[in-house]
Amino acid sequence: MQINLQTDGGGPNRPPFLLPGYPESFPVNDTRPQHTGLEGRIAELIAPGLESIGYELVRVAIMGKQTPTVQIMADRADQTPLSLDDCERISHLVSAVLDVDDPISSAWTLEVSSAGIDRPLTRVKDWNRYAGHLARIDLDVPTASGRKRLTGTVLGADEAQARVKLDSGETVDLPHAHIRRAKLVLTEELIKATETPPAAN
């Protein structure tokens, strides 16, 4: 599920959670994605507002330079599938927040989507929730054996590192700061695990 919105920046309405007396910078915790730079600033700005209306931020990505696209990936807090209405609510909130703070000086496009089944692993809770499933991981810092691209079974994570069992049987601990990206591999087991259970009669 995805929607797009284009904006030229600036806006008159300050969201209630950014009124005077509310902090405009929030620390990243184990339930929020870890970002740096402009993506980190945007994550700090929008995550509290999303949480206040029942959503969780999964990832912020900025693509392009001339007219950048701000990609927001989110979940519902209750873990039910994200709908088009949800994407629209998220889009309106994010646009209002970014128009107030104006972290991007030029025109930009907003893209809001669900994480999908083969989702990125960006938070400690993602690594723990999907323990037992296969993931592909790209590293900025190689492992002791010199590898920067791994495929293995997720074993879980804490605030410092994620643990993965490789196909060779070796278990490795990967500091979050060394992980460039990590994403679940689409398998039958993952599809079954993420199927929405039938509604009770």
UniProtKB/Swiss-Prot annotation:
Q: Name one GO biological process term.
A: ribosomal small subunit assembly
This protein's GO CC annotations: cytosol
Q: Which domain of life is it from?
A: Bacteria
SUPFAM superfamilies (alphabetical) = YhbC-like, C-terminal domain (SSF74942), YhbC-like, N-terminal domain (SSF75420)
- What keywords appear on the UniProt entry? Cytoplasm, Ribosome biogenesis
Gene3D superfamilies hit by this protein: RimP-like superfamily, N-terminal
What's its job? Required for maturation of 30S ribosomal subunits.
Q: Which HAMAP family match?
A: RimP (MF_01077)
**What name has this protein been given in UniProt?**
Ribosome maturation factor RimP
